[in-house]
């Protein structure tokens, strides 16, 4: 039987079964938000699998049907919020009703049975995870404790670019992604394991992360939306997820075993290099919490942190932290190269505040309003997760007079909201950091979930718990790249020639990697650390030369 005939049979059976089982006259019709009519079985999935990325396709549909829109996506109702007002209703007014996550293969397979941070359903385990993130993993104290690590990796990134000077253009994302991955690995799993980056094992892990982002972000995975076809795994997505999980599980098991051995050495009074409490990373914190849970009888099984939970947490931290920061920095540099006057303004601010005798530190960031505006404007135009992570309606809810049935998928199109003329009347599609400066319309707008016209990290209960760390990584990254190098496009390339096409997945990165020329503009010893570093007035970052040199290998 041909594939076309098989599909026709499936469609026919589906239509007959729906007709027979439909509750005609037995229930009150739902007052659903307006939206497009879909096809049998697939609903409006075809509109999301076309040439346009899903967030752009949904924005075009919302322009016709309204800011609160209903679609039938496979077997599910889906409601899409595409304005600041409707986002406020979904993420604040009815936050609790939509605080759940849909059950997906990514959560079941890739997140060790929903044991991570991102895909965890609303309930006791999620409350434990949220508290853990707020008080242990991403608290201000914990984030600040890794400031030295972040500064060292920023110097290493600058050194890598410095060594490329005079050799022509560089692929920006390759350098930034390498530094970001090492940074996150050092914070999450320790110096020893971050050192594998560039080795065959490290390269395999990086490729695994890239493939995981591609496969878990596939909107066209039919089994996710039509569960009764899921067992067929038509596109092989679940099979790929299982293979990827096996690969990174081996890596994580080695890491956890190594941390167990470190703890044993401490208990026996024979600590080795890197075994002190000052060298503890996030895995050390998580394993300590596993032990505490085991010794606490009141901890229920539903909220207990386990070894698999530790691996799921680490995977979410490493994958999410690396991808989001690197992608955002590359978009920021792309926009600056397309607007040379904005690049000059950013450089002038850095020269005025920092000078040419030292690098930018995180303590300097509050004094760099234009750099902050560049980052906000980049996140407005290029949110890494343009539809956020889908929400799941825990109960039937009425939103703006419309019914949202229990079990519906709820999406917030933050990409459309950030380009909505109602919220951004001044050229919403243009890159204008000035809109966030004092005296401008966006001066008071922040990215931390209080202003619904700008939601790169979401808002409410399911807001990204690592937004504070992400802002430090991205803002310091952009500041040091602009401060340390004079950037220009390759010869013969004009600003308008820079492609801004997107590649949609779990994150939305550039389809064409940014290539540019980076010319050092600071004294050479700042890149090579050949002279003893000096204590920076007002900064706790000193002696950055203790970081072992490495080369970014791709």
Swiss-Prot record:
Name the coenzymes or cofactors required: heme
> Record's SUPFAM superfamilies?
Cytochrome P450
- Read off the InterPro entries from this record: Cyt_P450, Cyt_P450_CS, Cyt_P450_E_grp-I, Cyt_P450_sf
State if Membrane is listed as a keyword. Answer: yes
Give the induction annotation: Strongly induced in response to herbivory-mediated wounding.
Which pathway does this polypeptide act in?
Secondary metabolite biosynthesis; terpenoid biosynthesis
- Which Pfam families does the record associate with it? p450
Which PROSITE patterns does this chain map to? CYTOCHROME_P450
The entry's function note states: Component of the volatile terpenes biosynthesis pathways. Converts mainly geranyllinalool to trimethyltridecatetraene (TMTT).
Protein family per UniProt: Belongs to the cytochrome P450 family.
UniProt-recorded name of the protein: Trimethyltridecatetraene synthase
What species does this protein belong to?
Zea mays
User: What does UniProt list as this organism's lineage?
Assistant: Eukaryota, Viridiplantae, Streptophyta, Embryophyta, Tracheophyta
Q: Which gene encodes it?
A: CYP92C6
């Amino acid at each position: 039987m041909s594939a076309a005939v098989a599909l026709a049979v499936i469609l026919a059976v589906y239509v007959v079964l729906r007709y027979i089982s439909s509750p005609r006259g037995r229930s009150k019709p739902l007052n659903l938000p307006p939206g497009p009519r879909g096809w049998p079985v697939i609903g409006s999935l075809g509109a999301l699998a076309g040439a346009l990325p899903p967030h752009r396709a949904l924005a075009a549909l919302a322009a016709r049907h309204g800011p609160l829109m209903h679609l039938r996506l496979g077997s599910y109702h889906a409601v899409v919020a595409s304005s600041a007002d409707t986002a406020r209703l979904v993420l604040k007014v009815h936050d609790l009703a939509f605080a759940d996550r849909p059950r997906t293969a990514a959560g079941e397979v890739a997140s060790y049975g929903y044991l991570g941070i991102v895909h965890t359903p609303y309930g006791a385990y999620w409350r434990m995870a949220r508290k853990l993130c707020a008080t242990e993993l991403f608290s201000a104290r914990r984030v600040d404790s890794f400031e030295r690590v972040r500064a060292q990796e920023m110097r290493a990134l600058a050194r890598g670019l410095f060594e490329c000077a005079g050799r022509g253009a560089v692929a920006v994302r390759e350098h930034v992604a390498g530094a970001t991955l090492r940074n996150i690995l050092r914070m999450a799993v320790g110096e020893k394991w971050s050192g594998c980056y560039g080795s065959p094992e490290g390269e395999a892990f990086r490729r695994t992360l890239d493939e995981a982002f591609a496969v878990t972000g596939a909107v066209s995975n039919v089994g996710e939306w039509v569960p009764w076809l899921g067992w067929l795994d038509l596109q092989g997505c679940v099979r790929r997820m299982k293979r990827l999980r096996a690969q990174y599980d081996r890596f994580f098991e080695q890491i956890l075993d190594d941390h167990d051995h470190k703890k044993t050495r401490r208990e026996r009074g024979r600590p080795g290099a890197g075994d002190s409490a000052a060298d503890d990373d996030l895995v050390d914190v998580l394993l300590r919490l596993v032990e505490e849970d085991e010794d606490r009888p009141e901890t229920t099984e539903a909220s207990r942190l386990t070894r698999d939970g530790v691996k799921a947490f680490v995977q979410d931290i490493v994958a999410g932290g690396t991808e989001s920061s690197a992608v955002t920095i590359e978009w920021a540099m792309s926009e600056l190269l397309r607007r040379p006057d904005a690049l000059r303004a950013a450089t002038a601010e850095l020269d005025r505040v920092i000078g040419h005798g030292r690098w930018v530190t995180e303590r300097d960031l509050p004094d760099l309003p234009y750099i902050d505006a560049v980052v906000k404007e980049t996140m407005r135009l290029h949110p890494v997760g343009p539809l956020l992570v889908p929400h799941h309606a825990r109960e039937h809810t009425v939103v703006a007079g419309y019914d949202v049935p229990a079990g519906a998928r709820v999406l917030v199109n933050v990409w459309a909201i950030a380009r909505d003329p109602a919220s951004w009347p001044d050229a919403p599609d243009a890159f204008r950091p000035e809109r966030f400066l004092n005296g401008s319309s966006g001066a008071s707008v922040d990215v931390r979930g209080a202003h619904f016209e700008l939601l790169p990290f979401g808002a409410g209960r399911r807001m990204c718990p690592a937004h504070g760390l992400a802002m430090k990584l991205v803002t310091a990254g952009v500041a040091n790249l602009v401060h340390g190098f004079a950037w220009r496009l390759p010869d013969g390339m004009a600003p308008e020639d820079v492609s801004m096409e997107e590649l949609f997945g779990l994150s939305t990165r550039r389809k064409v990697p940014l290539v540019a020329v980076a010319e050092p503009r600071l004294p050479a010893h700042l890149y090579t650390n050949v002279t003893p570093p000096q204590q920076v007035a007002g900064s706790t970052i000193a002696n950055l030369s203790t970081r072992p040199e490495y080369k970014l290998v791709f």
